[in-house]
């Protein structure tokens, strides 16, 4: 199963006002291809994708928040699953794309290549709706659970490899965070950024 196939199925089910947080690397670029939106927050550093999504879900309980994480990324901050279970935001949906490797820096195997089961870890933390997806049919079934209330954790076993993608320098991550923050300001009618007389992206 390829990650792009999964993301394509997920993109078809995502609403315009869903907030989507991605990890760094191939997931980010593929999601940008499928669903370019100011409601996307890209390139969360290792270990930070699920925690940032958790914070958003708690701050905006009326908005659905979707985390697009990876096995290597999540393994660096497994305690975040305990935090998710403790707080139990009903609007948080976590999809982990598990290729059993740290693909971006060269394909070194991750712990899931040696038997570590992220679904069992999530269940052990108390996230009852934790499911594997080993083929596209199973993944489609997990996507159908998006509309149900409660934390959702899906670990999708995927192949290594990605579609042809734009180079990293075509995405301005600082500007993306600014766009995301102003999108939240506009849609929630709440201040996020301190008022400035000039944009930080036009100052010399």
PLM features per residue range, with description:
Residues 13, 17, 56-59:
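Generic N-terminal helix/loop capping motif
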Residues 2, 141, 193-197:
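Short, intrinsically disordered low-complexity segments
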Residues 3-6, 30-179:
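Thiamine diphosphate
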Residues 1-16:
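Active-site pocket-lining segments that scaffold enzyme catalytic pockets across diverse folds
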Residues 169-204:
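SAM-dependent methyltransferases
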Residues 17-36:
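Acidic-glycine-rich active-site phosphate/pyrophosphate-binding loop
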